[in-house]
Amino acid sequence: MRTISNQKYEITDMAHEEYPFLHRIRALRDICGEIRAGDIGGFVEGESNLSAEPGDCAWIFDDAIAAGDAYVDRDACLRGDAIACGSAYVSKGSVMSGHSRAEDNAYLRGASMTGKALASGNAQIIHDPHTMGTPILSGNCKVYGTVQGDIHITGSAVILPCEEVRNDTRDTFVLSGKSRSVIRGIGRETLQPLQKEVSPMKTKTPKKRGVER
């Protein structure tokens, strides 16, 4: 079943064993090289869970689930047994895999979640647009606050609702349980010569009497 405007995928009658209100999707055409027409995907509750835009590579693979008011778009994907539910928004190339879960009003933008990582409450897991740093959640970590930039939250680390962990540097910050460490960026220890801008030569014209050059 699909709407007339959805030429990307259809919702099949293959129901989830535990949650029969969820059904698998099937690709109606080739999608971004990895998905072929006829390929079976993961589970959705309705078309409101996955973008149907023709040029959008967003997809739900394997046994992953998008349910409730959760929405996956802009080249993001769910793999493995990942779950996006509640009003979670997974976007901008984000990848959820393993048994990771995004729920409530969690927002993922250019982020990666794996293992049993949890993004809950009003969590925001977003990449840094300047450094292009990507936040990674793994292990059994739980994030309720904001994580931005090249930060790896892992182990049993917990980011509380009032906490903001931002990284606008070229290094990688690692938070694992109660420990914190830094992985220096490539080439950060090497000194480089100053790159001076060479200003173009200006041609001077003869100054006429009473006229500024």
Regions inferred by a protein language model and the residue ranges of each:
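Terminal amphipathic alpha-helical/low-complexity segments used for targeting or macromolecular assembly
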Residues: M1-C57, D63, D81, S87, ...
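Residues at the loop-to-beta-strand transition
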Residues: S48, A58, A64, A70, ...
